[in-house]
């Protein structure tokens, strides 16, 4: 009789994306239960190391989003504890989460990305800004469009300044790219499809991402064939260059007025509910339903993930 592995679903955590993480965790738990895995949900807190030692899972399914969850922190802890885990490893997670580092990677791969730079809170409040309207102000290490400000006019800037609590000490400011929002899924080292998003709001914000009916999903994206092909090529190129594992999602903006495509970011831990983009693309392109997608991620992580044995690490004397 085959042993069924114990799987710890890590969700919750400390970030602003906690609620979304809990939703992802519950969706994964439901899928794993239906697949007859032994699954337990763990709400990640400061005692996570002790919880993992007590649970001793064969695999940790990372359903965390945002800081500490997809930036290499939890991955590093799992490496130290010798526990296999899903999604990307430490370095890929850390670099992809940092929008400044990501831009350097995109440039090195000759992939266009919006012009931008790191700006201090002080310079934002003094309006010492070197980018013309419209522009985008966003955190360096956040996801789900949390803390993102679309500034189309001086009136928008004044509103931001009057509600300055969301302006962090260091942020990234970018030119605004008008046009079409695109998301490309990579699964098992293959770019499987690109979806177009048409939000009901001005942009694809937190509400539009996680509220049914606030955005229209168009598949395949209604863009020129050559642009569609380039989204697939760029998403796979970045996925492979960073060393991403199993699954990732790359985000783009396409401006049909001047036929330019800009890569915004790569997400190593994309949202993972049945309404999320990667599961939807997998279903539409490969006929893979949510439960099967969860199984693919679990099996790939169990059988193709090597955790370094501490005994193999070279000792320094």
Swiss-Prot record:
Its EC number is 6.3.2.4. Its main location: cytoplasm. Keywords: ATP-binding, Cell shape, Cell wall biogenesis/degradation, Cytoplasm, Ligase, Magnesium, Manganese, Metal-binding, Nucleotide-binding, Peptidoglycan synthesis. Mg(2+) 1 binds at residues 251, 265. It holds the Pfam family Dala_Dala_lig_N. GO terms for molecular function: ATP binding; D-alanine-D-alanine ligase activity; metal ion binding. Binds 2 magnesium or manganese ions per subunit. It is found in: Cytoplasm. Pathway: Cell wall biogenesis; peptidoglycan biosynthesis. Its cofactor is Mg(2+); Mn(2+). One of its GO terms (biological process) is peptidoglycan biosynthetic process. It comes from the Bacteria. Residues 103-299 form the ATP-grasp domain. This is D-alanine--D-alanine ligase. The gene is ddl.
